[in-house]
Amino acid sequence: MEAIKGSDVNVPDAVFAWMLDGRGGVKPLENTDVIDEAHPCWLHLNYVHHDSAQWLATTPLLPNNVRDALAGESTRPRVSRFGEGTLITLRCINGSTDERPDQLVAMRVYMDGRLIVSTRQRKVLALDDVVSDLEEGTGPTDCGGWLVDVCDALTDHSSEFIEQLHDKIIDLEDNLLDQQIPPRGFLALLRKQLIVMRRYMAPQRDVYARLASERLPWMSDDQRRRMQDIADRLGRGLDEIDACIARTGVMADEIAQVMQENLARRTYTMSLMAMVFLPSTFLTGLFGVNLGGIPGGGWQFGFSIFCILLVVLIGGVALWLHRSKWL
């Protein structure tokens, strides 16, 4: 591969433009630098910035299809070969478990043995781990190591997010055992998060597996083995997601059953109350007809005796219901 001049890559509004020093560190890219396989360059761009968008649209260092893909709409994770270069689209978890993950953060990468061009619109928090290692001098030394470290960081964030969702499901199951129903929409959000994760992480696992199997010239055998380990780790996370989705379905049925039982219990209680007071209601209605005069209306103890009879009647009905094991 021919060397690249630093002035051809240095974009004024780039998030950062660094050269890997081959010892785990980086230095800012200068216009006089020479970019080659021994000293690759990492150019990280926000494709909505003016200078970055113009560079992506006009640079001869990228194939036409790659230029469009790096600044295009978000797609599912995939990997494509373009001659000596490779275009990779990845997804990352940025938010917390309380947010709606309708769209995961997308990061697109084009790389060969000399140049790494990554683009994004929203910040990719997982890259902070790789950036921190490079600034401390303990980061990757070449393009293959950079890609493995980035995929490892993305998988770490995904695994942490899946673990948090798993913990929330365990808490929800414990609450259901105590007949505690979650707030409205809580389970729907949880299930939405799991489904979105499953949608994007499954093809991302396939991307990792393909990168591990492809004989890319800038990846060593050790780096391919590490990439396969990352794919396997993400695969285990997907198995956990599938299990969590199944558990949320069971919990939805359990919540519906608990709510139905509560409704049935309240209806049963109201029915028993109506049964207890039904005889007294009949007697008070009968006495209140007053067609031939109220019986005992002229007796001073008539009303008191009638109230006592009602209490005895209600108590008798309640006792009968209790002995019949309805109460």
Curated annotation (Swiss-Prot):
Q: Does the keyword RNA-binding apply?
A: no
Q: Which residues lie on this side of the membrane: Periplasmic?
A: 295-300
Please give the Pfam families that the UniProt record associates with this protein. Answer: CorA
Membrane topology according to the record? Multi-pass membrane protein
How is this protein annotated for GO cellular component?
plasma membrane
The catalytic activity, as recorded, is: Zn(2+)(out) + H(+)(out) = Zn(2+)(in) + H(+)(in)
Top-level taxonomic group? Bacteria
Predominant location:
membrane
Give the residue spans that cross the bilayer.
274-294, 301-321
Supply the alphabetized keyword list: Cell inner membrane, Cell membrane, Ion transport, Membrane, Transmembrane, Transmembrane helix, Transport, Zinc
Return one GO MF term: magnesium ion binding
Per the UniProt topology annotation, the Cytoplasmic ranges are: 1-273, 322-327
The places in or outside the cell where this protein is found are: Cell inner membrane
Tell whether Secreted is among the UniProt keywords. Answer: no
Query: Matching InterPro entries, A to Z?
Result: CorA_cytoplasmic_dom, CorA_TM1_TM2, MgTranspt_CorA/ZnTranspt_ZntB, Zn_transp_ZntB
Q: What PANTHER family does the record point to?
A: CORA FAMILY METAL ION TRANSPORTER (EUROFUNG), ZINC TRANSPORT PROTEIN ZNTB
Its function, per the record, reads:
Zinc transporter. Acts as a Zn(2+):proton symporter, which likely mediates zinc ion uptake.
Assigned protein family: Belongs to the CorA metal ion transporter (MIT) (TC 1.A.35) family.
The protein's name in its UniProt record = Zinc transport protein ZntB
Q: Which organism is it from?
A: Shigella flexneri
